[in-house]
């Protein structure tokens, strides 16, 4: 949950913003991996507010 919120605040504007939260999330909950990868492949420029909404759903 903490990793999801952190990822939402950073957004997905760069690869670094995607890698760090992904690594952090892997240690907390493996179910987050698939969603993060799907989001990255679908659109790497998600808006922070949209990611926050998805993060709340994941949590």
Curated annotation (Swiss-Prot):
Keyword terms of this UniProt record: Signal
Domain of life from the UniProt record: Bacteria
Signal sequence residues: 1-17
The protein, known as: Uncharacterized protein RP088
């Amino acid at each position: 949950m903490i990793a999801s919120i952190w990822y939402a605040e950073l957004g997905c504007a760069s690869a670094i913003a995607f890698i760090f939260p992904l690594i952090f999330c892997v240690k907390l909950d493996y179910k987050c991996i698939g969603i993060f990868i799907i989001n990255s492949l679908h659109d790497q420029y998600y808006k922070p507010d949209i990611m926050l909404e998805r993060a709340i759903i994941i949590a």
